[in-house]
């Protein structure tokens, strides 16, 4: 991963309020714009990193963020290794698409290291281990909380990075948690250089997770249209109808018995449903997928309403 100092030295950081450069002086982070509120009041520093957030237009609250020193408001425990492997067959979609993204970027950056941004990257996403271990990629990551795998705290609704500053963007399991996905998608487009590549994967038929911080779902077509100013390289389901059904059993049992542990037990009993995803017809499965993905290249020519009707790749 790039060091925070490298982002400063390369003038990549901008004010999320007004877009002026961000300056660090005597440990304080301020906007260089003469009339900006963040020129007077510095950005908070939490867990040693700046929170480059326009708090007036964010679900984040500056005082609360300072009080918890940038810690996540949501508990981030994952089930233990063996249990996780049983319930979640390895995600092969993300590594395949990210490898393709890097291969395409490398032919274009001609020797320059590709710069890839991870939006909502507080944890290393499923199947992204190889990307994080790749010493030839300049990785930037941020999230709404401070984490050892991010360089700063930020909000995807106003990404504090300069226009056209990255070659690739990864946004995995994040767009359901933002209030305005179209705004976040247009920020992704803004920070990508012309011809830059996005990989997004997002839930479709998944129950609420992360409690109060869960807002939206996407069909495969809706997800593709969110990235309307991108040319499609590939898209489809990440986890299919079997996984969606296992989640439904879990949450049905929770609701019926008023017990989360009993829901988890039911999920374990039906673990095999997730493993059926690979056997299912892809067209029917995408209509009932647990999550969908889109890999695409930024373009000047957006698709329109009739293009998205032609795009439909389900089974009806
Ligand atoms: C389900 S987690 C996925 C995390 C990681 N991408 C992964 O796949 O392991 C959703 C993430 O979105 C982040 N998030 C929520 N709202 C956000 C926002 N407005 N801007 C950036 N990240 C956000 C959350 O903090 C959380 O880390
Ligand atoms: Zn500013």
Task: Please annotate each region the language model reported.
Residues 178-179, 192-194:
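Helix-to-beta-strand junctions that scaffold the AdoMet/dcAdoMet cofactor pocket
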Residues 182-187, 197-316:
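S-adenosyl-L-methionine-dependent methyltransferase catalytic module, highlighting the catalytic core
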Residues 1-164, 168-171, 289-292, 299-316:
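Conserved N-terminal segment of class I S-adenosyl-L-methionine
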Residues 172, 179, 188:
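Ligand/cofactor pocket segment of small-molecule handling proteins
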Residues 38, 158, 176, 206, ...:
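Active-site micro-motifs of SAM-dependent methyltransferase domains
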Residues 171-174, 200:
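A short beta-strand submotif of the Rossmann-like class I SAM-dependent methyltransferase core
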Residues 126-127, 179, 208:
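Glycine/Thr-rich phosphate-binding loops of Rossmann-like dinucleotide-binding domains
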Residues 160-162, 179, 219:
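GHKL-family ATP-binding catalytic core of two-component histidine kinases
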């Amino acid at each position: 991963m790039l060091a925070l100092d490298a982002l400063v030295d390369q003038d990549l950081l901008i004010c999320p309020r007004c877009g002026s450069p961000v300056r660090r002086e005597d440990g304080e982070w301020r906007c260089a714009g003469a009339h900006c509120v963040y020129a007077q009041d510095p950005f908070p520093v939490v867990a040693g990193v700046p929170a480059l957030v326009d708090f007036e237009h964010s679900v984040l609250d500056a005082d609360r963020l300072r009080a918890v020193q940038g810690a996540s408001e949501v508990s981030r425990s994952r089930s233990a290794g063996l249990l996780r492997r049983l319930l979640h067959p390895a995600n092969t979609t993300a590594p395949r698409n990210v490898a393709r993204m890097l291969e395409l970027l490398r032919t274009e950056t001609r020797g320059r290291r590709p710069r890839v941004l991870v939006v909502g990257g507080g944890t290393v996403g499923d199947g992204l281990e190889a990307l994080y271990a790749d010493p030839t990629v300049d990785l930037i990551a941020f999230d709404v909380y401070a984490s050892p795998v991010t360089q700063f705290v930020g909000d995807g609704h106003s990404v504090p990075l300069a226009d056209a500053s990255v070659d690739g963007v990864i946004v995995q399991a994040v767009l359901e948690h933002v209030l305005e996905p179209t705004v976040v998608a247009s920020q992704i487009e803004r920070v990508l250089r012309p011809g830059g590549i996005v990989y997004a994967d997002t839930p479709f038929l998944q129950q609420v997770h992360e409690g109060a911080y869960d807002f939206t779902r996407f069909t495969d077509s809706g997800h593709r249209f969110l990235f309307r100013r991108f040319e499609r390289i590939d898209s489809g389901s990440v986890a299919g109808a079997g996984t969606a059904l296992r989640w439904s059993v879990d949450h049905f049992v929770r609701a019926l018995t008023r017990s989360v542990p009993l829901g988890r037990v039911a999920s374990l009993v039906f673990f095999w449903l997730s493993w059926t995803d690979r056997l299912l017809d892809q067209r029917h499965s995408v209509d009932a997928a647990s999550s969908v993905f889109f890999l695409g290249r930024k373009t000047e020519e957006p698709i329109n309403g009739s293009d998205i009707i032609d795009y439909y790749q389900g089974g009806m």
